[in-house]
UniProtKB/Swiss-Prot annotation:
PROSITE patterns the UniProt entry points to: EGF_1 (PS00022), EGF_2 (PS01186), EGF_3 (PS50026)
Keywords: Disulfide bond, EGF-like domain, Repeat, Signal
Tissues where this protein is expressed: Component of the organic matrix of calcified shell layers.
Keyword Repeat attached: yes
One cellular-component annotation, GO: cell surface
Domain of life: Eukaryota
Protein name: Gigasin-2
GO molecular function, one term: signaling receptor binding
InterPro entries linked to this entry: Dev_Signal_Modulators, EGF-like_dom
Gene3D superfamilies assigned: Laminin
Signal peptide (residue range): 1-21
Cystine crosslinks: 25-39, 33-45, 47-56, 69-79, 73-85, 87-96
Source organism of the structure: Magallana gigas
Length: 340
């Protein structure tokens, strides 16, 4: 049995402000009426008896009552066949939990995602430029849907750059925002197309009270060592360093290993965040070694006292942002027995 103790230094959340257009069966590319429904001139479906929904895709007799439904349909989804959800236009996913156009946050970038029907023949792009800021098709993780995506770095200085608003919505927060255009026909914008705002919020994780934490309250001890095993406080770039972690104050735990290690720096003036994931699922990422141009090892070995196994991440000191401190986000896995 593994006991995980995640420690997160940087808090991220994703907020999307989206204006959804109504379903319009006159649009090209997979927006018709199903099961013999008739598309009205004004864009709504006239469904045959026994069917309902914006595209007539829901058979009335299959709709489940609240007592018979085991699915938690969100965003106005309708439960049918006890455990399935029929989603309104603008939402997808098994539980209708995913907006069809949304932004996700990463420490240094925004990922804009748009899901459209497989027959979609239109375009999705950032409003600044239809061609150079377009979302491109990528492999989809939603069945029977096409996925379009664009990754924009927070530091992007091109015409596709994001709008940055500090201290929004709260003091210390930073909101990254852009406007996305979705059309149903290539190189055309009509009254049935949509324009929507999407945004990501970096929440302020630096406010709080100072509190002394004992070894009993804090389950692991971390120390930075030089190659001779002596503690260090500061290093020059490219000097060897070992980050050592050992369990303290947890009964029956005989060892620890690093499952995930991410380092990042925050520019003191612009709040720009630069991050690099070094270890994931206990393995050193080759891309991190190549990008940082340093050797990295992640391993466990017996402590000097011979009573427990300690985790060690060995590398050379490096700089992400000149003049700014490095921070870390870590996941540890504790081992209840000494490995044999």
């Amino acid at each position: 049995m593994n006991k995980m103790s995640p420690l997160y230094v940087l808090a991220l959340c994703c907020l999307a402000t989206t204006v959804f257009a109504k379903y319009d069966c006159t649009n090209n590319g997979g927006y018709g009426c199903k099961y013999g429904g008739t598309c009205h001139f004004y864009g709504f479906c006239i469904c045959p008896k026994g069917f309902q929904g914006e595209d007539c895709g829901l058979k009335t007799e299959l709709i489940s009552t609240a007592a018979n439904c085991t699915a938690e349909c969100k965003n106005g989804g309708t439960c049918y066949e006890s455990d399935r959800c029929y989603c309104p236009h603008g939402f997808i996913g098994d539980m209708c939990e995913i907006p069809d156009t949304v932004a996700r946050c990463a420490p240094d970038r925004m990922i804009i995602e748009a899901y459209r029907p497989l027959g979609f023949v239109g375009e999705v792009y950032m409003f600044q430029n239809r061609k150079s800021c377009a979302l491109k098709q990528v492999p989809s993780d939603i069945r029977d849907m096409m996925k379009l995506e664009r990754v924009v770095l927070h530091s992007d200085k091109t015409e596709c750059a994001l709008t940055r608003t500090p201290d929004t919505p709260k003091l210390g927060d930073v909101t990254m925002k852009t406007t996305v255009v979705s059309t149903h026909n290539y190189n055309q914008f009509g009254p049935r197309d949509s324009i929507m705002d999407v945004s990501c919020v970096h929440t302020n994780s630096f406010q709080g009270s100072t509190k002394e934490i004992t070894e009993t309250a804090f389950p692991f001890r971390m120390v930075a060592l030089d190659m001779n095993g002596e503690p260090v406080q500061a290093l020059a770039a490219n000097e060897s360093i070992i980050l050592q972690f050992e369990p303290v104050g947890i009964p029956d735990v005989r060892g620890v290993m690093v499952e995930y290690l991410e380092v990042y720096s925050i520019n003191a003036n612009s709040n720009e965040v630069v991050s690099k994931t070094i270890i994931e699922n206990g393995c050193v990422l080759r891309t991190a070694q190549q990008h940082l141009e340093i050797p990295i090892r992640n391993y466990s070995e017996m402590x000097r006292q011979g009573t427990s196994w300690v985790a060690r991440s060995a590398m050379r000191a490096f700089i992400l942002l000149p003049g700014d401190h490095c921070y870390s986000s870590l996941d540890y896995a504790s081992v209840p027995e000494v490995p044999r």
